[in-house]
């Protein structure tokens, strides 16, 4: 076992703390390579979903349950042609207080083969007070590749009164179609002398983005777009007075904001991809949103993402 581990370490890129390869083995998607070193740990359970789905599952875990100041986690994932793989976590990724202004960093580079499916469905990132976090994710795809990306973060330990107290958060997502840019997105939150992050975010505690790309996911895209449009048309509808059009009854100057706000936008040629953006007051409301809208992935993955505990 030690000799095998040494060979894996030598084969992995020098800067990588993790490397995964998924290939077809006897008609099923299987993890044929799984290398990780501190501070990353990768677990590939043999039974994570229905066997009939033929999908491979992978759990990314950090020692101690979080990322400390100065840690750099770099992982590569290769999903072979016709394979299906899901990468998730067991709990939210905690980012601890920065020391000497050092960022905690995560970098993921994934290659999704032809007619393959890769679902990156982690729990949210939770930055503690004074934390600094930077994340970059790059996905290489083909015209018939299928990709699900959930990228989300919370305000911190808000139930304990720690709300938007981190110093810096940046997340970058790139999708390259045959090495040409297809989707580029960046989210940046940084404390300012004029307005704090808390001032700007008001009562909202969660920000999320969901990317759906590929022919196998078109029905999920369409359903999500339709349901989000209906949900927001109801939530953002101006209040009407019971007295009718000419009523003098006063309306509230500051109507209550909806507990969850979402929007959907297509991208790519012929709308082959879709991005949904969500902000919400509570983490559980986003879990419910993801659980509902991604339930249709079960036939591909053998299990529903974000199952109710």
From Swiss-Prot:
Keywords on record: Chaperone, Nickel insertion
InterPro entries: UreD (IPR002669)
Coiled coil: none
Top-level lineage group: Eukaryota
MF annotations from Gene Ontology: nickel cation binding
Metal-binding as UniProt keyword: no
HAMAP family registered for this protein in UniProt: UreD
UniProt-listed PANTHER family: UREASE ACCESSORY PROTEIN D
Similarity-based family: Belongs to the UreD family.
Record note on quaternary structure: URED, UREF and UREG may form a complex that acts as a GTP-hydrolysis-dependent molecular chaperone, activating the urease apoprotein.
Purpose: Required for the maturation and activation of urease via the functional incorporation of the urease nickel metallocenter.
Protein name: Urease accessory protein D
